[in-house]
């Protein structure tokens, strides 16, 4: 584990900050649809949930195939490289979607978000398993999920509430809070993944050799 600390740190930091942005977005978008477009909250949840269940499922399968394609091309850092590409796409999508003034375009963007979000869903477990010895995989994955989940679910949604109540001090600015959370968290994730590419490749080669 000491030999892979840079690699593991890049994965944990990337997915902790990315998770904060993702769960903030997932938690508050239905309420955003209610406040901005006067949707019934149950309809907002139904529409968003349906997009996640259908288009998101397609994205999850597509993401696995994309990873395998990149890996077969010789990129040993494929899990991090694929995740970085996905985060780069999600960054503008998540920053722009909450401030779109048209509900129909917003729904289309939520469809794009659902597909791309689930596209990277399996990347972090794959990344950890590929560089961890067999007898340590369960422990390392468990620690990763504990830390990432704590930040993602425990802190992510609260950031939006804090921005709305204390920064903007206006409930109608919820959309700006969601957007700002993505603007802050996702660049950290992308940078962490980028810095982790070379250490990850070294870690992968050590395990294989």
Please give the residue ranges for each predicted region.
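C-terminal transmembrane helical hairpin of 12-TM major facilitator-type secondary transporters
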Residues: 76-124
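Conserved glycine-rich helix-kink/hinge and helix-boundary motifs of the Major Facilitator Superfamily
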Residues: 12, 45-46, 84, 138-143, ...
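Primarily residues marking transmembrane-helix entry/exit sites
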Residues: 4-12, 103-107, 138
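Extracytoplasmic gate region of multi-pass secondary transporters
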Residues: 4-63, 117-121, 125, 152-160
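Helix-to-loop junctions at the C-terminal end of transmembrane segments
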Residues: 59-75, 164
């Amino acid at each position: 584990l000491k030999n892979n600390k840079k690699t593991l740190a890049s994965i944990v930091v990337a997915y902790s900050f990315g998770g904060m942005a993702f769960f903030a977005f997932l938690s508050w978008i239905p309420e955003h649809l209610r406040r901005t477009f006067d949707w019934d909250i149950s309809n907002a949840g139904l529409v968003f949930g349906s997009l996640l269940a259908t288009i998101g499922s397609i994205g999850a399968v597509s993401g696995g195939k994309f990873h395998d394609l990149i890996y077969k091309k010789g990129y040993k850092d494929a899990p991090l490289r694929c995740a970085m590409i996905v985060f780069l796409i999600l960054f503008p999508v998540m920053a722009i979607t909450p401030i779109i003034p048209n509900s129909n375009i917003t729904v289309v963007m939520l469809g794009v978000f659902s597909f791309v979000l689930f596209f990277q869903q399996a990347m972090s477990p794959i990344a950890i398993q590929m560089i961890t010895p067999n007898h340590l995989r369960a422990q390392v994955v468990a620690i990763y999920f504990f830390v990432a989940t704590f930040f993602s679910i425990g802190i992510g949604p609260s950031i939006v509430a804090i921005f709305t109540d204390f920064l903007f001090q206006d409930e109608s600015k919820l959309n700006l809070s969601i957007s700002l959370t993505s603007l802050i968290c996702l660049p950290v994730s992308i940078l962490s993944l980028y810095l982790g590419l070379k250490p990850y490749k070294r870690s992968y080669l050590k395990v294989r050799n």
